[in-house]
Amino acid sequence: MKRILTGITPSGYPHLGNYIGAIKPSLDLLDGKCESFLFIADLHAVIKVSDPKKLEELSNAIAMAWLASGLDPNKTNFYRQSDVPEITELAWLLSCIAAVSYTHLR
């Protein structure tokens, strides 16, 4: 089974680039033959957005853009990155055993 994994960093309000670069291509790939994981990469945004209320506002705006573009949350795994503690746990474990240069795929 094919899998799709992509996310959008809520470092600003949704724009055409988000739609053309991530939302539309992802929605075009969705069918009953693939498992999809589409997310809001809010952990990636904390270096650019320091105000928690603003980050929540931008995260909600990104979620609304996905949904307004036709995403059916009943047919995909749609989540906020910070809601999955295993992501930060894995990042911490990897940072303990691997240099950053080894974590980049080539």
What does each model-identified segment do?
Residues 100:
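Short loop/turn segments at secondary-structure transitions that flank enzyme active sites
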